[in-house]
Amino acid sequence: KERLLETHLFLKKKRCGKIKGRTVAGGNKQRGYIDKHDASSPTVSTQALLLTCIVEAHEGRDVMTVDIPNAFIQTRVEDPQHRVLVKIKGYLAELLLEIAPEVYGDYVYVDKKGIPVIIAECWNAIYGTMIAGLLYYVKFCGTLDRLGFVANPYEACVHNRIAAEKQQTVCFHVDDLKSSGEEVANDQLVKEL
């Protein structure tokens, strides 16, 4: 019961008028049994980021930034020890039941206050859990590896490859990426990701 994480749904109206929803798990409960040093994802250092900016300006590189959409939820949690149980309740539970009654119907119960509740084991990384960032980091580094990038030996979140006969550099912080090189190489990277 102590490892059961509450979920929270946050809605935000974007400038374009669309409503963006984000469901997160309350990973703060995990602090009692997961050490943050065992679960933290590396991030690009300020010095490395600034150094790449200097190189980009000096070489006249094309620079782009990309946000990888839905990064965590696309990351499979292979180790059962890292999977979490989440409690989905209220409107979100009702919505899931309405969308897919054949999937969730057997797993919904009503609590003492009359609120529908679903307990689910997550086989994919969930935003808000302590281990999600690290699992995504490992997956993303594997993707960069397959695309021919080589990790910088001094900076875990800076990777390089030769593309369009010139060096291409990526720096990243979890699911936010900065790439520099030839424009054609940056365009190709977007397609590859």
Protein language model features and the residues they cover:
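Long, low-complexity, charge-biased intrinsically disordered regions
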Residues: 1-193
